[in-house]
Structure formats: C-alpha cells, structure tokens
Amino acid sequence: MNKKPIILGIESSCDETAASIITENEQGMPTILSSIVSSQVDVHKEFGGVVPELAARSHMEKIDLITKKAFDKSGVKMEDLDAIAATAGPGLMVCLSVGLSFGKAMASSLNKPFIAVNHLEGHALSPKLNSELNYPYLLLLISGGHTQFLSVQGLGNYKRLGTTIDDAVGEAFDKTAKLLGIEFPGGPQIEVYAKKGDPNKYELPKPIFHKGGCNLSFAGLKTAVLKISKQIKTEQEKYDLAASFQKTIEEILYKKSKIAFEEFKKMNTINKNKFVVAGGVAANKRIREVLTNLCKEEEFEAIFPPINLCGDNAAMIAMVGLEKFKLKQFSELDSPAKPRWPLDADAAFLKGAGVRL
C-alpha cells in the first residue's frame, strides 16, 4: 500500500496565525487532520484595523504554539511529514516573513521539500477540501483585499476575467461597519444588522454596473455610505443602511457574475459548468443564497468552501501544497515573500484612479 502524503501548511499573511496538517484518504480525497487558527481580533480592536507591526509580533509569539497544536491534534510526528507549505504572498510583508521563515526553517531542519504558496491560490483550491472539483471552473474570489473573477484552468493556470478597479468588496463591508460604529472586525456583522433593516430605504450607487464587463467598483458605494452615515440618528437607520448596502452588493455580484458566466463559457466547453465562490466574504449567507439562485437559473453548479474555511486558514495552504507535492513542484529555501502576487501574472494591472472603462 502506497503511503499517502502528509503536508503541513503555515499561514501568516495578515492577522491570522494558522497551521494545518492534511493528507489523503484511500479514495485520494484530501483529509484535514488538524486546522488551527488563532485570530488577532483583540490585538487590533482598539485601532479599528490591522496594524502590521503588531500583527507580525503576534505571529512570532504564537506560531510555535499553533503549529504544536496542529501536530498534537493530528497525531502526526514531524518526521512523518512529506513537505512543508507556507504562504509566501500576497499579504503584509512583515507578516508573510514570519510564517515563511518558520516554514523554511522546518523544511531545512527536517530535510523535507518546501513549497511556497500563493495565498489566493489557497482560496481558489479551498473547496477541494470538502468536495470533488475538477478543472476548469469559474472562480469568484471575494475577500478583504481582493475581488476578481478567474477562469481556473488548472493548478497554477489562471485567466482573469474581471477585477475590482478600486476597492475590494470585503473592504467595503469593513468600512461600512466602521461608519455604523460596529466594533472591529465589523464586516461580518453587516449581515446581522441587515436582517433588522429595510433594504429599500436607501438608494445606493452601483458603479460601472452597466459597463466594464465583469470588472467591479466599490469606491463610489463607500462614499455614498459615508455621506448617509453622517445623517443617521437612530439604531433603526443603521439597520436600514446596512440592509441597503447588503442588497446593493448582492445586486452587483449577481449582475457581474452573470456576465462572467458568459465569458467563462466562451473560453471553456464542458458538460457541467462550475462556479466556485471563495474568500472571507463567501461566508456571507445572503450572498451565498443569491449566487446559488443565479447558478440554478444559468445551469452552473454552485460550490462554496465550508464557512470555517472561507477566511484565512492553513488547511487551504496545505491543500495547494498537496497538489504541488504530487507534481513535485517544490520551492527553493530562498524563495522571497511577495506582498503582491497576482494569480494571473499576464493580466493588466487595473487598480488606480486613472482607469477608464
């Protein structure tokens, strides 16, 4: 019987310190043996956002303990590992360096292969941890730092169909939460507030809604929320603004996803089209519901990671490591951290005030 590979994943790109050990079952499906995530909410709460230097210090203080917990829960010994995978980017440079250095040191001391992982590729492959997923598929990556549509042709082969030209959708959620006085991290609480509000109370803008293909924009929406928030006097008005904001995001993602479906079908001729939605914002239940309904209308299969694997975690990093290990795609121990590391390196850089669509 062939030994199944055992991979350790390390994640420290922003404000979660995470370690995970995964393997495969007899059917070749990934199996999570352990997944430990330590959040830094209490560290950054008083500042209303992530402070890079404090985040890096917290990573350095916790990474040993978090990794030990991953080993303890999995029952795996260090010498049983087949490879160590660590996030190398994109993310905050000072934070990336902690996990990357830790992973390299482990690989060197154990004489095991090291695999530098693109954090975004981790999100892209995260649904493979709980479902069979073959290439190609359409990916909507929605998080605090990224919002983009990609045709996933294979491991390491991504074709960007559309992206935000300014802010990420997760950032818009976080900014709206802050304006409503919701304690950090407030983005996920918008959905809770929205349930108590009238989604038709405020008419909010949907930038580049009728142009730009499946590119997106959220800066104008954020500005509108800022203006309205200054006039709010009651809790109910906060709920109404949250509900109106949530509804606007749903409408934008519905419309732009529908356009992306057509672009994807032009590139790929397959029997069953699949639509993967991943990243922290994919945990939003209303967005899941709206995009699932769209998939039913357009005959796409909707695929989401489990809620606990939508945010940053190391299981998805180990998942990429597992795929790369099987292809013997190893990295050098001097692999650098990459604060910016697009999945589609050939795609034009769209972000910036000079973009005209």
Curated annotation (Swiss-Prot):
Ligand binding (Fe cation): H119, H123, D312
CDD domains for this protein: ASKHA_NBD_TsaD_bac (cd24133)
Any one Pfam family match given in the protein's UniProt record, by short name: TsaD
Recorded catalytic activity of this chain's protein: L-threonylcarbamoyladenylate + adenosine(37) in tRNA = N(6)-L-threonylcarbamoyladenosine(37) in tRNA + AMP + H(+)
UniProt main location, coarse: cytoplasm
Cofactor needs: Fe(2+)
One GO-annotated biological process of the protein: tRNA threonylcarbamoyladenosine modification
InterPro entries associated with the record: ATPase_NBD, Gcp-like_dom, KAE1/TsaD, Peptidase_M22_CS, TsaD
GO CC field: cytoplasm
Assigned EC number: 2.3.1.234
Compartmental location: Cytoplasm
GO molecular-function terms, A-Z: iron ion binding; N(6)-L-threonylcarbamoyladenine synthase activity
Cofactor note text: Binds 1 Fe(2+) ion per subunit.
Keywords: Acyltransferase, Cytoplasm, Iron, Metal-binding, Transferase, tRNA processing
Binding site for substrate: L141, I142, S143, G144, G145, D174, G187, N284
Free-text function comment from the UniProt entry: Required for the formation of a threonylcarbamoyl group on adenosine at position 37 (t(6)A37) in tRNAs that read codons beginning with adenine. Is involved in the transfer of the threonylcarbamoyl moiety of threonylcarbamoyl-AMP (TC-AMP) to the N6 group of A37, together with TsaE and TsaB. TsaD likely plays a direct catalytic role in this reaction.
Record family assignment: Belongs to the KAE1 / TsaD family.
Protein name: tRNA N6-adenosine threonylcarbamoyltransferase
UniProt lineage: Bacteria, Pseudomonadati, Pseudomonadota, Alphaproteobacteria, Candidatus Pelagibacterales
Gene this chain is encoded by: tsaD
